[in-house]
């Protein structure tokens, strides 16, 4: 759900436009509830309690939160988890927790912003400023937990900043064999720099970590909000620990049961559809240098993007021209929320009419967590690749080609960037944990699933599928043009539905549909 941070920094772009390992240690508990581990070998981990302290002395947390963690509402803690759940005595890692508390005695609400690879710690300031309502935060402490391998929780490392720049700027490999080889080389780089976390940053382990976090927070049940990829972690948790499910909201739902190439197919179609809305709106407003029907504008955009392969555009950084890969990344990033479409129109107009790729490069960098000095604030790029490669199982060549043909047929503009996902998994040098599966969560308390009708990254029908899989799933349909629904600007229908459920346990009425405000 990186669009939250993108929205938080989009004001800067608007200004630009106007100008042109250890063992677990006992800590002081918030609660004294005795919590039993699911197996005796894990009891020491479950006996931990989060020892909250001021964050100001933690330079890493301060950097990740742009200094906000020094404010009195923020507190920090660490929780120790086993590196391998199959062998809990074989080393440990630490998870970074940061909470935002406005009310004394409030319950903890754990959230995951998405990804995989998205840092909850890094996103916490923007989440409490723009996403969670004051009403919700009056009843809950908002707890950010970076999953294993991500952000400040034993981050997996693969590439240097310079190598990441090169990787992001390069056009995707064209053939199956090239994809496999590129994946193999990247995987070997991860194994060289992070031999343990390159093997143990899978979602199954991250989900089990969540239960130790629950215990460390002194809670019999976990209250949780997951956005995008965070819905997958939440669904896995509910299926594995149904009796520990408290109030669960899964917004922008992934279907946990489908293979990687089907995920790619859904996203290719979702972005292709939202791009059509964006082109039509930009044309009507006279904001883009494209003319004609939607299909004609898509063709013109595709032709222009192709020219960037041989002739990338100059930018404000003389050493970093705008390539096709970077331009596509920027445009897609701005499709996550229709409130950022104006920036996409301006960036495209600057690039096509003025031969200047500066705006689109800045957007692509913001989305990738690249800082002005050339470093990357988080390891989101590395973590995204590693986690997906560990989570998914590759399809055989025949099945993979079937999906590729469908993607190219149904998403002619963007489809090329979404095909042959299984080839990347197959080339990865670490065996997949194959964590994707159908979930039931038998016996769990009600789980609220939210799907937005024109969500480009997590299509609405995935929310329908997840709701059907979960025995206690309850679907809230939201009509809108963005990725995930809940935020302060979502309108009362959405925020009241979610807040009432989280605070009082009252589910929205069966079949309820909300409408996001039009931008």
Question: Where do the model's predicted regions map?
Answer:
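Classical Sec-dependent N-terminal signal peptides that target proteins to the secretory pathway
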Residues: 11-13
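Bacterial N-terminal signal peptides that target proteins for export
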Residues: 1-8
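Bacterial signal peptide processing site
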Residues: 21-24
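Gly/Pro-rich cap/lid or specificity-loop segments adjacent to the active site
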Residues: 29-326, 386-519
């Amino acid at each position: 759900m990186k669009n939250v941070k993108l929205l938080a920094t989009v004001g800067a772009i608007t200004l630009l436009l106007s100008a042109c390992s250890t063992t677990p240690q006992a800590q002081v508990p918030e609660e004294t509830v005795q919590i039993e581990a699911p197996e005796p070998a894990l009891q020491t981990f479950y006996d931990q309690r989060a020892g909250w302290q001021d964050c100001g002395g933690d330079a890493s947390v301060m950097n990740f939160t742009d200094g906000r963690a020094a404010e009195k509402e923020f507190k920090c803690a660490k929780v120790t988890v086993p590196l391998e759940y199959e062998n809990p005595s074989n080393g440990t890692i630490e998870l970074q927790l940061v909470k935002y508390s406005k009310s004394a005695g409030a319950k903890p609400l754990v959230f995951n912003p998405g990804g995989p690879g998205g840092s909850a710690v890094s996103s916490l300031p923007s989440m409490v400023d723009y996403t969670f309502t004051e009403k919700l935060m009056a009843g809950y402490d908002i707890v950010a937990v970076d999953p294993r391998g991500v952000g400040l929780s034993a981050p997996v490392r693969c590439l240097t900043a310079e190598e990441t720049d090169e990787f992001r700027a390069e056009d995707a490999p064209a053939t199956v064999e090239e994809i496999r080889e590129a994946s193999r080389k990247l995987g070997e780089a991860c194994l060289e720099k992070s031999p343990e976390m390159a093997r143990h940053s899978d979602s199954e382990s991250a989900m089990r970590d969540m239960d130790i976090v629950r215990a460390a927070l002194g809670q019999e049940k976990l209250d949780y909000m997951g956005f995008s990829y965070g819905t997958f972690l939440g669904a896995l948790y509910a299926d594995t620990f149904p009796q520990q499910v408290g109030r669960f909201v899964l917004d922008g739902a992934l279907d946990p049961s489908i293979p990687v190439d089907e995920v790619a197919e859904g996203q290719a179609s979702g972005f292709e559809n939202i791009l059509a809305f964006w082109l039509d709106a930009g044309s009507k407003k006279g904001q883009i240098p494209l003319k004609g029907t939607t299909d004609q504008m898509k063709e013109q955009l595709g032709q222009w993007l192709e020219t960037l392969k041989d002739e990338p555009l100059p930018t404000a950084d003389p050493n970093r021209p705008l390539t096709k890969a970077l331009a596509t990344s920027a445009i897609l990033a701005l499709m996550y929320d229709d409130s950022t479409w104006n920036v996409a129109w301006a960036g495209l107009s600057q690039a096509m009419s003025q031969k200047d790729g500066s705006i689109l490069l800045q957007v692509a960098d913001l989305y990738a967590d690249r800082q002005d000095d050339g470093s990357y604030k988080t390891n989101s790029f590395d973590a995204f690749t590693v986690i997906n490669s560990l989570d998914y199982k590759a399809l055989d060549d025949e099945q993979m080609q079937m999906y590729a043909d469908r993607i190219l047929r149904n998403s002619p503009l963007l489809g090329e960037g979404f095909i042959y996902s299984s080839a990347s998994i197959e080339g990865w040098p670490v065996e997949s944990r194959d964590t994707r599966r159908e979930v039931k969560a038998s016996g769990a308390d009600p789980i609220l699933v939210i799907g937005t009708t024109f969500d480009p990254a997590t299509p609405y029908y995935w929310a329908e599928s997840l709701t059907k899989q979960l025995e206690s799933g309850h679907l809230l349909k939201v009509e809108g043009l963005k990725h995930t629904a809940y935020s302060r600007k979502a309108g009362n229908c959405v925020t009241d539905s979610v807040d009432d459920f989280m605070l009082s346990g009252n589910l929205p009425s069966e079949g309820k549909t909300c409408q996001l405000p039009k931008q």
